[in-house]
């Protein structure tokens, strides 16, 4: 991986280069053809949180979102790596309550809030973080909603669970690839590996969804619209992807710990 990586970004301090960042990048058009690449577009990697919109696709396309009356706010939160500010955790709590569930039904672990005020409030109240404070609790609430819809078992993060099978199907449909394997993400859910080009194709598929009329594409449009309507729920105040979505109108920018992807319609 590192031998084929190329120089992407330099950080300078004064007149001296302080650090150099290397990696891989690829741009594809709506047909999935490579427009420009740096490094190896066939590099296999984990897209992690930047592909939560793919993981949310079965939630909408299955009819689960409509059955349980999910709003655009719920759908945006299902795609989130949020700060655990009150706007995030209150919505997750209400969502779980409407499902007849609670914090203990989430398979993600507890996590200290990234939001400063929420962190201080917990400290002042001498309370420990809960699972709703996990930055992936929105995604997991979406998983629980789909679990309820499918009448499946409680261990929705198992690789053999119908929810995770639906997620893999969504990945392979949008990337037009077969995943070579999976790993367990920090929130306990499986994350499937694909090529960089494959994930770029998936983002292009989302970006071009309005030109198609099938159920999956209509669901993708709904997901993108939800993220653009509520960028503060996708991450939070001061976060790069939230600010970028506000500034670059019409573009969705889900961020991960290692990269950021930009699904956007190519101008004609």
What are these regions (language model features)?
Residues 258-264:
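Conserved small/polar residues in nucleotide/adenosyl-binding loops
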Residues 190-209, 219-226, 260:
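Active-site-proximal alpha-helical segments within enzyme catalytic domains
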Residues 17, 47, 132-139, 158-163, ...:
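Short, contiguous, pocket-lining structural segments
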Residues 1-2, 71-179, 187:
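Active-site-adjacent helix/loop patches that line small-molecule binding or acyl-intermediate pockets
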Residues 47-64:
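Active-site SXXK
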Residues 1-42:
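Beta-lactamase-like hydrolase cores
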